[in-house]
Amino acid sequence: LFLIGCESGLRFSDYSRIQPHDFMREELHIVPKKTKKQGAKKVIIPLSDRFKRILNKYNGVLPNYERSQLTRFNKIIREICQNVGMNDEIKFYREIAGKTVKVTKLKYEEVSSHTCRRTFCTLKFLKGMPAQAIMKFSGHTSERNFLKYLKLDAELTAQKYRGYF
């Protein structure tokens, strides 16, 4: 299910409730829950080869999680990430009680269901997909908010834009 999130760019509340009837012509057709309040906006996501392989593995029926199971889902994902060796130390800054504080954690501790969405946006951007197109799939309405999702470290940025120098 985590990989489906990475392949679709959807929120947990959406990728955890995908049903077989949401698939048409090798596309996922879904109305994200968050946008229902703002007017139903269907999102159509072409299925990647990886997405199709996962669907085939489960005969078109993906596991479903209720919103109440999000904490459990995140715990399982973190355990998997720890077990596969995502134990690098990462340092970042966080606003705590109005102060900017340097935080050090192990990489797996920061992985969650929301990592899927950030991964989707970052990978599509690195492949050269225009930001406006990615936003259509991810449901972002403001480029400012979308750009916060991109996780481009210095090395990835240099790799992506090397041709400009």
Model-predicted regions and their roles:
Residues 21-27, 110, 126-148:
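Short, polar N-cap/turn motifs at the start of nucleic acid-interacting alpha helices
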Residues 1-13, 122-123:
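Short pre-functional
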Residues 78-136:
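Short, basic (Lys/Arg/His-rich) helix/loop patches that form interaction surfaces
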Residues 50-99:
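Major-groove DNA-contacting interfaces characterized by cationic-aromatic clusters
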Residues 34-36, 138-163:
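Catalytic-site neighborhood detector that most strongly recognizes the C-terminal catalytic loop/helix
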Residues 8, 17-54:
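Conserved tyrosine-mediated DNA breakage-rejoining catalytic core shared by Y-recombinases
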Residues 1-3, 23-25, 35-37, 69, ...:
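Conserved catalytic core of the tyrosine transesterase superfamily
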Residues 5, 16, 135:
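The alpha-helix within a helix-turn-helix
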